């Protein structure tokens, strides 16, 4: 699955480089920010970040999708340092992230912001948002006003069998707004726009936030940019 990691790269890089709060010496630090990669098939992107932090090494990347490695095809909680939850089934990670944001809100209210104060960041794909489990979780997050939840929608308009428009023409900006989310739209390859959008989302105190990153699959790949076949091709 090469195309998706390319289109999700700019957001993920900006998040880890400029915003995500974590301890490189302790991946289980209790007040770390959480990041959930809902499209688990984009695991190569996540493992690359783990390698740059130092939680994985080049040898682990070379063993990608090999039996017994720390870098399976889909991220597994408890196997790979820095993986917050096991993802793969589309939509599941969205619900996982909402659950983490609920936990943060409960603990923050119980123990105060001096002890618990972190964000839950979510990245989801076109396929994730089409799943009922994701849509139900999104509705719940908006209803409860989980303002420490910040999502990024990698809208690259491609799925493994073809263009998204073949099967779905939902207006997801309107969908999110109708579920009480703060919505921003950016160019998914514009890192400064992404930085600005995350800063604005962090200032929102009444609603969860979603940043819709308009993109194409496999951006920058000279012969394959925009080609849905990169979704599942090596």
Protein language model features and the residues they cover:
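Short catalytic-loop micro-motif centered on adjacent basic/acidic residues
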Residues: 1-2, 122-124, 182-187
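A short, conserved beta-to-alpha structural element at the edge of catalytic cores
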Residues: 141-168
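Structural motif
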Residues: 36, 119-124, 150-152, 210-214
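Short secondary-structure boundary/capping segments
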Residues: 52-53, 136-139, 165-170, 201, ...
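Flexible loop/turn segments at secondary-structure boundaries
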Residues: 44, 129-131, 158-161, 192-194, ...
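Conserved thiamine diphosphate
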Residues: 108-116, 164-197
